[in-house]
A protein has these predicted regions:
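Conserved nucleotidyltransferase catalytic core and NTase-mimicking acidic/glycine-rich helix/loop elements
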Residues: 1-95
Length: 95
């Protein structure tokens, strides 16, 4: 679960590699959410950014940045993922 992994990583591991893996997982969740809402599978994340919410766009953009070798801002990126995953749980979406 992304939420649990994020909390554990923020408190204990503080691993950039774990954070990157969590963002990769989150990108698949965003893709699934978009499919559920639109009934249209969007393969490319660059296209997915155009049909998702602001928070989900942020998750995709951070993941793409990390995937392309971008710098990790551990605190900021962890907080963004934590807030997004918490919100998805409250809304009732499985993570």
């Amino acid at each position: 679960n992304i939420y649990h992994g994020c909390v554990h990583n923020m408190l204990h591991e503080k691993s950039e590699d774990i954070l990157k893996a969590l963002y990769k997982s989150a990108s698949f969740v965003v893709q699934a959410i978009a499919f559920k809402e639109t009934r249209n599978y969007i393969k490319h994340l660059s296209e997915l950014r155009n049909v998702v919410t602001y928070e989900e766009r942020t998750i995709i953009e951070i993941f793409l940045n990390l995937k392309n070798g971008g710098t990790v801002d551990f605190h900021l990126m962890s907080e963004a993922l934590f807030a997004w995953s918490r919100k998805r749980i409250v809304k009732g979406s499985a993570l």
